[in-house]
């Protein structure tokens, strides 16, 4: 399937979880049943979805801080899902270069949101750095993600 398509699947799943608020594990398992997914695809998707879910308070705090004049509840659920993935990758996935995380998030926003979403996502993610990690997060925790 490839990393781009896997990221897109993860974003759709996060969006679905944000909208439906039903059994998370059941929805993840259903999404991972897709026969076109490789073992690597499944691992990436599950890792992103679980990681974003676990770090949502941190990710949302960063969005609130960086999105000047915007509140989380005013963002579309698509934009929120895209931003959470982008920030999660930037902060917790050292195997994914910063520029790739930003570019992929921008492409998802352009594809699934409104015409201004790509620029909004790009501008916000450009402001994110490892310095945004909460103080209690150790370097070892970041490296193990």
Curated annotation (Swiss-Prot):
A single BP term in Gene Ontology: DNA-templated transcription termination
Gene3D superfamilies referenced in this protein's UniProt entry, alphabetically: NusB-like (1.10.940.10)
Xref: InterPro entries: NusB-like_sf (IPR035926), NusB_fam (IPR011605), NusB_RsmB_TIM44 (IPR006027)
Domain of life: Bacteria
Keyword set includes Transcription regulation: yes
Molecular-function GO term, any one: RNA binding
Keyword Aminoacyl-tRNA synthetase: no
Keyword terms, alphabetized: RNA-binding, Transcription, Transcription antitermination, Transcription regulation
GO terms under cellular component: cytosol
Function text: Involved in transcription antitermination. Required for transcription of ribosomal RNA (rRNA) genes. Binds specifically to the boxA antiterminator sequence of the ribosomal RNA (rrn) operons.
Similarity comment: Belongs to the NusB family.
Name recorded for this polypeptide: Transcription antitermination protein NusB
Species this protein is from: Ruminiclostridium cellulolyticum (strain ATCC 35319 / DSM 5812 / JCM 6584 / H10) (Clostridium cellulolyticum)
């Amino acid at each position: 399937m490839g990393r781009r398509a896997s990221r897109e699947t993860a974003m759709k799943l996060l969006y679905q979880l944000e909208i439906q608020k039903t059994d998370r594990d059941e929805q993840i398992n259903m999404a991972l049943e897709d026969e076109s997914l490789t073992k690597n695809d499944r691992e990436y998707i599950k890792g992103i979805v679980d990681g974003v879910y676990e770090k949502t308070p941190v990710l949302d705090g960063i969005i609130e801080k960086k999105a000047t004049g915007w509140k989380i509840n005013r963002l579309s659920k698509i934009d929120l899902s895209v931003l959470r993935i982008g920030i999660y990758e930037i902060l917790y996935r050292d195997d994914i270069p910063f520029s790739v995380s930003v570019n992929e998030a921008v492409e998802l926003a352009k594809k699934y949101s409104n015409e201004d979403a790509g620029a909004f996502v790009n501008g916000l993610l450009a402001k994110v750095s490892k310095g945004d990690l909460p103080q209690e997060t150790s370097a070892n925790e970041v490296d193990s993600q």
